[in-house]
Amino acid sequence: MNKVYKVIWNASIGAWVATSEIAKSKTKTKSKTLNLSAAVLSGVICFAPNAFAGTNTEGGIGQGTSISGTTSCREGSANTANQKDIAIGCGAQTQDRTGSNIANRNNPYNNSTGAYAGAMKQGGAISVGTGAVVEKGLGTAIGSYATTQGISGVAIGTGALSSGNTALAVGRQSAATADFSQAIGNVAAATGKGSLAIGHSATAEGYRSIAIGSPDIENADPVAGQAGAAYQPKMATKATGKDSIAFGGGAVATEENALAIGAFSESKGKKSVAIGTGAKAQKDNAVVIGDQAEASFEGGVAIGKGARSEAENSIALGKDSKASQATGESFLTKQSAPTGVLSIGDIGTERRIQNVADGAADSDAATVRQLKAARTHYVSINDNGQPGGNFENDGATGRNAIAVGVNASAAGREAMAIGGNAQAIGSGAIAMGSSSQTVGRGDVAIGRNASTQGAEGVNSNQSVAIGDQTKAIGDQSVAIGADVIAKGNSSVAIGGDDVDKIARDTELSNTYTEITGGTLQAGKYPTTEANHGSTAVGVQAVGTGAFSSAFGMTSKATGDASSAFGVMSNASGKGAAAFGAVAQATGDGASAMGINSLASGTNSTAIGSGNKPGEGANATGNSSAAIGSGAQATGDNSAAIGKGAEATNENAAAVGGGAKATGKNAAAIGGGAIADQENAVAVGQGAQSLVEGGVALGARSKVEAKNSVALGQDAVATEATGTSFLTNRDASQSNGVISVGSAGKERRITNVEDGSADSDAVTVRQLKNVDSRVNQNTSNIGKNTQNITNLNQKLDDTKTNLGNQIADTNKNLNDAKKDLGNQITDTNTKLNTTKDQLTTQINDTNTELNNTIGNTKTELNTKIDNTKTELENKGLNFAGNSGADVHRKLGDKLNIVGGAAASTPAAKTSGENVITRTTQDGIQIELLKDSKFDSVTTGNTTLNTNGLTIKEGPSITKQGINAGSKQISNVADGINAKDAVNVDQLTKVKDNLNGRITDTNNQLNDAKKDLGNQIADTNKNLNDAKKDLGNQITDTNTKLNNTKDQLTTQINDTKTELNNTIGNTKTELNSKIDSTKTELENKGLNFAGNSGADVHRKLGEKLNIIGGAAASTPAAKTSGENVITRTTKDGIQIELLKDSKFDSVTTGNTTLNTNGLTIKEGPSITKDGINASGKQITNVADGVNAKDAVNKGQLDNLAAKQNATDDAAVKYDDAKTKDKVTLKGKDGTVLDNVKAGHISSTSKEAVNGSQIHNISNSIKNSIGGNTVVNPDGSLTTNNIGGTGKNNINDAISEVKNTATKAKTTVTEGDNIVVKETVNKDGSTNYEVSTKKDLTLNSVTTGDTVLNNNGLTIKDGPSITKDGVNAGGKKITDVANGVIAQNSKDAVNGAQVHHISNSIKNSIGGNTVVNPDGSLTTNNIGGTGKNNINDAIKSVDEKVTNGVNDLTQKGLNFGANDQKTTQGKAVHRKLGDTINIVGGADAKTAEDKTSGENIITRTTEDGVKIEMLKDVKFDSVNVGGHVLNQQGLIIKGGPSITVNGINAGGKQITNVADGINAKDAVNKGQLDKQINEVKDQIGKDIGKLSDHAVQYDKDKNGNVDKSSVTLGGGEKGTNLKNVADGKVAEGSKDAVNGGQLWNVQNQVDKNSNDIKNIQNNIDNISNGKAGLVQQQKPNGEITVGRDTGGTSINMAGKEGDRVVQGVKDGEIKAGSNQAVNGGQIHKISESIKNSIGGNTTIDPKDGSITTNNIGGTGKNNINDAIGTLNQSNQELGNKITNLGDQLQQVFYDTNKRIDDVEKKANAGIAAAMALENAPFVAGKYTYAVGAAYHGGENAVGVTLRKTSDNGRWSITGGVAAASQGEPSVRVGISGVIN
């Protein structure tokens, strides 16, 4: 009979109890409240096939609810141990462990053969079933022997085990052993935390793992007769990895994040995925999808049935696809095999990939459409059916190389070979054409058999060979044409070898012969050829001379630097130039211009054409000039100007058509003029000077007499004959005559001055005067005769008178004769004067004409090629750091020199320290910062391979350090045996032995003062000399300027006259020459350094050759004597003398100058001595002589006896200051028997361990709780106030945090706004709304998506971060964008059209703008060309035809060795590069070099490179000796660095007596000390122990520095005046009472703060001072050995002494040992840790500072606790309020429980109303029921359908109760066997 139970309220115990409605009224002795018992019972009823089929309630026992049978329970009645427990069923217990055996299903996770009911740990548990056990509170165990061991765990099913917290195990012998795990199914196991296992034998072992599925159940072992019930490990579903998932029968996921879905799928790699029946992902990150698909390598992907990925990172896509390991290089690109592949099939089952978009990136897949578009048309390679090399596209073996063609090979990096048998071997080389070959770097060979390969072992670089059979075999050579050879470095050959067609063309051949006189020969093929630096352009052109140029067919330039322009032109002389067809320039420096011109003389010039060979200008004489057709200048220095002009003798000049000057120094000027004798001059048309020295001036004038002059047209000067009139002088044949006319054509000489000398010409005026006097005399004679006749009679009378008259008359006649003679003489004199004047004028005219001729010659030679004149003069300007710019004409030599002698052999110089860099301004010369020299001299200081030597000063060499009788000052105390010692150390020895060293006077300042005066006088003299020299220079400059002005005036006048004379010629030549001027100016020269880009300078521009020193550096600061330059093949190499001299050398902090060696903040060695700068002088050999330095070993030996007795003494660290005592124990030293020191704020006395212990103990008592005093005096605090915290700060913070919790906050999330308001009832209202401005990841509206990347419209435009994509649409209505350099605006079509139109207008002509904006141009500028490039090229070709030999002339560069036989000038063409290099590696980094030591100055000869006398280097290496920032290191010898002086095991000799404390001492001083103290040793030393504090001795009598026992007896000894020791962890310093007082004072304060308890610590009684003596002021302290407590006063003069090396003393009650700062710090640290928070320790005195303890804002414990109390009070108020609120919650909860009770009763009634329908095979059956329970009622209807064979049935039902919602039930039942 079914029993009915109900739940009633037991008012006596205040609990609900379950009781039978029909049993006797028998209550349990005790019961426990179960608030939700109704729900639990209804759940239990639902599990039963028949509701409440059971027994009465008499069988249960215990304090809770126990329900079981009373008589048939073999296992015993149900039993509960707690009031809240429920045990239902026989043997169900919540206390004792009793049980029985169950059938074992071999679950390895739950294989117990016995189930026991265990004692309940806490209440609230449910166990239902025989042997069901719940071991933790709130657990549930339902089923026979079900066990729950974790809190809130659930175990449902026979033998189910739930051992993890909140774990769930459902199913027979299922196990959920980990926290939060779930196991559902027969023998299912969930052992991983948070794992889930569902299904037979399903196992989830990993953290958060999931296993769903069953194994091979049919083959599982039977259990108790049940087939397949045992745990089946085979094909079991398993998830063993962290976060792994196995879903499906036999699925396995063994690694972290592995996923296996499908029957027997396997995922055995980390983060691997296997989906599909039998799918296997064996390695990490593998992905497998498909039946039997498999990926066996890491990262593999297999998708599709049977797909296999058998290589790492490979993908197999599609049914039976296979992805294997990739091998071999990639086709075409030759990339190595990748690490993975993508396979969409297998061999024989390949697949096609369809609907592939065109690829864009290099690694994108390409489509057939792209291949069709990329297919190259009209390209094919025919191997005639015979595959050759490169058939497999493997001919390109170099990196990034290209090989196209049969047998083509490209072995060089980035090389290209195109054509059959083409070979590109060099890096970057190009070979195009059959059998073409390039072997050098950057070579280009284009054409059949074109090659850049020279003889064996000779290969070119960057050469170009273009044409059939063409070869370019020199570096940077160019060969273009058929059978052309450019065999020289930097050569250019353009042309060919075949003139057959021209030779066979009669007309052309005849033309060639007419012009050249030669014959073209068919069948002969001389090749176009160019040598080093040469250029040959034209068929059969030859440029074999170095730096030569040959332009034109069959032209030849065979001389070095020669130039030949024109067909068959020839320039065979060095520097020769031939311009024009058949022009011949065969002499060195010769110039021939014009057809058939010839210049064969050295430096000769021939300008003029002739129709036939020999008819052109001919200059065969050296320095001769022939200008004009047929002009002949055959004499040296001769000049023939004009058609057919001849100058055949030395210095002869013929100017004018047909003019002939055949005599030496003769001049013929004018058409047909002849001067055929030496010094003859003929000026004028047809003028002839046919005698030596004759001058014919005037048209057709003629001189036939030697030294005669014919002046005037048609004048004839013949030989003089006869005697002179009156004077009867014979004519002079040697002096010649002057003729101003000829017979019948005499000329009047007018405007003649009256003659005065006998040889002067007389004038008509003078003759008239003579004639007048003669007439007067004749008249007188006539009168006298008449008188005689008329007066005969008077004859006798008058005879005497007459005689007198006759005598007078005779006298008068004689006088008249004499006067007439004088007049004639005067006339002759005047005539002679006139002759001289005429001669002078003729000579002046001759000179003027000669000047005109010479100037015309010079001007024409210059103007023939204006570039050769103007540009030669323009040249280049060179500038240095200082000095005027230096100008060099083209061809001039620029000397780039240093100050060293040019004869200096190369072995004495080196360029390894020099490097040049090209800069924007020119060439910068720099020195390596780490330079190497054989020798460096700075004034009197020399640094070489032997070491450092200062003249008349100290030296440091391999042999040792010689102080040069100078002091070694500022020497640090020696430490090691070989260290130098200073006077201070020696003085200390002497003081210890009561001796004194007599001081000596230092006279260095006087010497320095005298030297300064001398330098000042020298400077004054130098300044005076400089001033005088400046005045002289000024005067010289003034004179030079005056001379310059005069010369300028003369030159200008001459130039004006010359321009007037040959202006027409100049005008004609200017237009031609100007066209090439600009080009040649721009060509200039290139300059290169060791590194940097080449620097280009136009002609006339300035090239700066500078150093890094300031340009303003005065010359006195620099010198070029260390610099030398040498010319090399590449240019100018700048070198430094290996033995260099400087005023100063600076390397970092180290300076070497004439005074010596100085290291900043380090030692120095100068003339004044050695200053060690507070550093040690180490490795000093033992001193021997009196002036040798002594080392510390010698000093130690001297003090050995004292040390023997003094070793046990405790000493001050510094005997003078007495502020510190360091005890020498290895692990510290224990000071025993230390009397308790006074503890106060001012105490300096040492304290002992017992005092520390007392303080620590007082702190312990103040803190209380678990505080412990450790043996070292520190404190340990644990769980202060039960807070779980170990320091006061954290404890207070913990209490504060607890008080401030229980706070509810509402915060705003993304796009959310929270508004807080207060309701009328005082409660808080939170209004939540969205923000007006939202922040979202993405917004999608239809086809439009707006996200972080931008705006995208499907199949339309997009605006994203990558830009605007119009999507194939037009962008219309675009406003005009800004067109500027930095504009990013879009532009529209109108703007583009406007631009195109403006370009059209700029080009002009026939330019047309097309509709699409493009431009069409035709016949630009009338050139016939249709594009600007070709048009400019066409114009440029016309300009370049005028380029001449000035390109070759360039500049010459000289160096120091140019002045010797060792070097020669370096020549560079215009546009070429001149390398100005040093010997350092060009790859030297810029931070390794510096130009700051170099300066360049321009001089008259060029640019002079100088170095600063005071130079700076990072390092100087001299023969292995290094001078750098650290100092000087001598290889194998001493060193002096910032760390001190290391003598290198050598003696320091010749050391002056040390004076100051830090001066070095010599052995003489040491010996003197020894002698002075020899008698004193032993007198007082033995008594030292009576006065000194000493270390203890060990059992062997040796000094034990780990212990010092003070001799104060039992009471100890006070250590007074102890300086504050360091209070820190690990400190071994002694601490004094003052420090402890500070600590104690702080502790007192903290103690008061903690519990407001005032602990007064009495002053510790201290004993009186014992026997402590200080022998004299600032002397040693000795502690007496008297018994009783004594103290050591360490106050000292300033009260700042410290006792160091104090070993840890004992800290305990009764301890009187001294403690050190480390112990005090440890105690303070423990106090700090106990207080916690922001507590800090002052390292000076160990005091403790606390801030904001526990976050209370208070700085002491008392206030913090007060704050805490207030918080606790506030917390109490909050708790009280919380209790009131909880009362209301309980009231509401009870009310809800009442409602639950009603609904539970209604639920029970509903369950009871669902009556089981009958079980009839093949039929539908039903049942209707009604029930009443606990005041609630229900009705129910059940429907059953049973199968025809009766083996299963399905049931469904519905019930409606008086409370709650309707209940629905569905179930299925069947028969297993």
From Swiss-Prot:
Residues 1-53 form the signal peptide. Disruption phenotype: Deletion decreases biofilm formation and decreases the virulence in the murine model of lethal infection. Residues 606-630 are annotated as: Disordered. It comes from the Bacteria. Residues 619-630 have a biased composition (Polar residues). GO terms for cellular component: cell outer membrane; cell surface. The keyword Metal-binding does not apply. Residues 1773-1873 are annotated as: Translocator domain. Residues 54-1772 are annotated as: Surface exposed passenger domain. The chain crosses the membrane at residues 1818-1828, 1832-1842, 1851-1857, 1861-1872. Might be a good vaccine candidate. The ability of Ata to engender anti-adhesive, bactericidal, opsonophagocytic, and protective antibodies validates its potential use as an antigenic target against multidrug-resistant A.baumannii infections. The keyword Coiled coil applies. One of its GO terms (biological process) is cell adhesion. CDD domains: LbR_YadA-like (cd12820). Induction: Expression is growth phase dependent. Expressed at high levels during early logarithmic phase, and expression declines throughout the logarithmic and stationary phases. Keywords: Cell adhesion, Cell outer membrane, Coiled coil, Membrane, Protein transport, Signal, Transmembrane, Transmembrane beta strand, Transport, Virulence. Its main location: other. Residues 785-873, 982-1062, 1635-1662 form a coiled coil. Belongs to the autotransporter-2 (AT-2) (TC 1.B.40) family. Important for biofilm formation, binding to various extracellular matrix/basal membrane (ECM/BM) proteins, adhesion to collagen type IV, and for survival in a mouse model of lethal infection. The signal peptide, cleaved at the inner membrane, guides the autotransporter protein to the periplasmic space. Then, insertion of the C-terminal translocator domain in the outer membrane forms a hydrophilic pore for the translocation of the passenger domain to the bacterial cell surface. Homotrimer. NCBIfam families: auto_Ata (NF033481). This is Adhesin Ata autotransporter. The gene is ata.
